[in-house]
């Protein structure tokens, strides 16, 4: 059964038009199209900004952000997995939820204008467990904002469309003045992933 599922996933992956297009354009991953769509709809990333990309590897969002902020801005990428270098991107190897990693980030920039997070928890396929893991991860990322996000800063975070998401959105509304829930066209249709775009951090 495991091999059948793996073969099905590989077949779907390589027939995906966004996977094909990302290879054709030499993007680091199909996630490039997601951040591009979010950016075009919301105009979040601007020249001169400092961006923190949490869970950055293989670097699709970091490279995209680097091009948007330009040489007057800066991108800090953080992941537990190594990532190939990108111009104007400072990569920090480490777990964002550990104090030592936050200290390393603060050595580059004390606070940032935008936090991006496209990471997912380990998925089991059991809804009750997966929903709980998503909300736990989302809450932990929201907590990171206290240490690293500037006042009036912005957050783009991946989440999971479920009943629990309403309560999490209320939490975000306590910290940000405005939020949007967004599902990019480039997300697979069967996927329940959504993106929360939050602006004007209240600090």
From Swiss-Prot:
GO CC aspect terms: cytoplasm
Pfam families: FtsJ
Matching PANTHER family: RIBOSOMAL RNA METHYLTRANSFERASE, RRNA METHYLTRANSFERASE 2, MITOCHONDRIAL
Disulfide bonds: none
Active site: 158 (proton acceptor)
Annotated residues for binding of S-adenosyl-L-methionine: 59, 61, 79, 95, 118
Keywords for the protein's UniProt record, in alphabetical order: Cytoplasm, Methyltransferase, rRNA processing, S-adenosyl-L-methionine, Transferase
Family note: Belongs to the class I-like SAM-binding methyltransferase superfamily. RNA methyltransferase RlmE family.
Catalytic activity: uridine(2552) in 23S rRNA + S-adenosyl-L-methionine = 2'-O-methyluridine(2552) in 23S rRNA + S-adenosyl-L-homocysteine + H(+)
EC number: 2.1.1.166
Gene3D superfamilies: Vaccinia Virus protein VP39 (3.40.50.150)
Top-tier EC class: transferase
Summary of the function given for this chain in its UniProt record: Specifically methylates the uridine in position 2552 of 23S rRNA at the 2'-O position of the ribose in the fully assembled 50S ribosomal subunit.
Location in or out of the cell: Cytoplasm
Nucleotidyltransferase found in the keyword field: no
This protein's name: Ribosomal RNA large subunit methyltransferase E
SUPFAM superfamilies named among the record's database cross-references: S-adenosyl-L-methionine-dependent methyltransferases
Iron as UniProt keyword: no
Cited InterPro entries: RNA_methyltr_RlmE (IPR050082), RNA_MeTrfase_FtsJ_dom (IPR002877), rRNA-MeTfrase_E (IPR015507), SAM-dependent_MTases_sf (IPR029063)
GO terms assigned for molecular function: rRNA (uridine-2'-O-)-methyltransferase activity
């Amino acid at each position: 059964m495991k091999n059948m599922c793996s073969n099905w996933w590989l077949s779907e992956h390589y027939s995906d038009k966004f996977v094909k297009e990302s290879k054709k354009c030499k993007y680091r991953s199909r996630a490039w199209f997601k951040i591009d769509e979010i950016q075009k709809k919301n105009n979040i990333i601007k020249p001169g900004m400092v961006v923190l990309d949490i869970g950055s590897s293989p670097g699709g969002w970091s490279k995209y952000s680097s091009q948007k902020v330009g040489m007057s801005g800066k991108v800090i990428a953080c992941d537990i997995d190594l990532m190939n270098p990108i111009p104007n991107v400072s990569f920090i190897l480490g777990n964002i939820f550990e104090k030592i990693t936050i200290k390393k980030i603060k050595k580059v920039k004390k606070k940032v204008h935008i936090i991006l997070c496209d990471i997912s928890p380990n998925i089991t396929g059991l809804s009750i467990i997966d929903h709980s893991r998503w909300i736990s991860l989302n809450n932990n990322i929201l907590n990171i904002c206290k240490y690293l996000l500037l006042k009036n800063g912005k957050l783009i975070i991946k989440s999971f469309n479920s009943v629990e998401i309403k309560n999490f959105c209320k939490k975000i509304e306590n910290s940000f003045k405005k939020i949007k829930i967004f599902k990019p066209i480039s997300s697979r249709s069967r996927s329940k992933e959504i993106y929360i775009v939050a602006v004007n951090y209240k600090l």
